[in-house]
Amino acid sequence: MYTSTFIFAKKEFDDEFHALDQAIAAAAKAIPGYRGEETWENSASGLVSNVYYWDTLEALHVLMKDPSHLLAKAGHAKWLDGYRVVIAEVQREYGVQGLGLTAAP
């Protein structure tokens, strides 16, 4: 299993941002190999973290090539005050499988 973690500092979100965000989420959920996602927000720092879980790197690469994702990436400076992406391979998972995930298998 792999994760793609998108950590960002928010600016103002407009209708275009929300439409792209919904389109990216729908595209991710339609990709074979998508396992789920979770979102965390730190109110003290203002940072948000979206974690997507994937069966394979190939599934993640499909999302990276999605037109909505490419549009959001090109326009990120309008909505974000900086971001960082972390791609990781999960070696082990313990506890309640799927706890905290939306759209868990």
Language-model-detected regions and their locations in the chain:
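Short S/T/G/P-rich N-terminal loop/turn motif that feeds into the first structured element of a domain
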Residues: 1-48, 57-65, 78-105
